[in-house]
Amino acid sequence: MLHIIVRRVSLVVALGLTLGACGAPAAPGAPTPAASPLVAATPSVPPQPTVEAVDGAGQTIRLAGPAQRIVSLAPSNTELLFAIGAGAQMVGRDEFSDYPEAAKALPAIATGMGKLNTEAVVALEPDLILAAEITPPDQVETLRGLGFTVFVVINPDDFEGLYANVLSLGTLTGRATQAQGLADELRDRVTAVGQKLSSATTSPRVFYELDGTDPTKPWTSGPGTFLDLLIRAAGGTNVGAVLSTQFAQISSEELVRQDPQIILLGDTAYGTTIEGVSARAGWGTMTAIKQKAVHPFDDNLVSRPGPRMVDGLEQLARLIHPELFAQQSEY
């Protein structure tokens, strides 16, 4: 839960002379004491508002004011910052923060292999570092040990969690109004998809390929993942839900048994092609292959828990239920 605590110092003016005037009159003949000169009170300057928020790790984070020099350690955080108008407050990023285009101009101080250039971070003098669930805990502790304020943004379990992350960053950056506007817009778009899908009479079986390096055992997303949630929210059934872990390999034999009606390729950026997948041994019997329902998909839309998750939902809905969106071009 977010709290913005604004402490202001109240001005207290001592009125000793006024109170003294209510005392007993001076004795007759007694010398009249000289009046003390009045000294005008100097108003105190109130301190800057204190920004306070609780991060995903349960840590209460306090800033003297909205962060102005931010380092982001995850693409999702970077996209959230730019989406609420706080991109200009960033001074550093991880190497995978490549969206929007303006983010690429920022110095990269962390790699996707979990390596962090602490010297580069120190040189940037950030007043806030945004970590993520993928950030190694020892890195978070190292940064805090160096005196930096680190806010951990966890992966959302649902859309409400996504909206909460938007609002958290709005609080920390002084962009609360913009963040609320973005959260409302995302919520409205998710609602619109749900309303459109309310007339769906089927829930097609969907296989989403994360990595087909071993085509006999491609990696996919299992139960309890945000991708699983997105597929279901888009009116489909995730065939990976039969797995026992969130991310795992699934055998070709199991895929044939599941018989996906739609195959989405999240690994086309790494060379996987529709033609190559269609020619895989044993895959020709799948409904998706026979009906040519194999589609490339921008994995960044569903693997980065940022504002473009809703773009991913809209695109998934169109691919899974094209009959419901045939006359519309808004998604």
Regions found by a protein language model. Name each.
Residues A67, N117-I134, S251-T268:
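Proline-aspartate-enriched helix->loop->beta-strand connector
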Residues R69-L124, L128-E133, Q139, V239:
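A short, structured surface patch at a secondary-structure boundary
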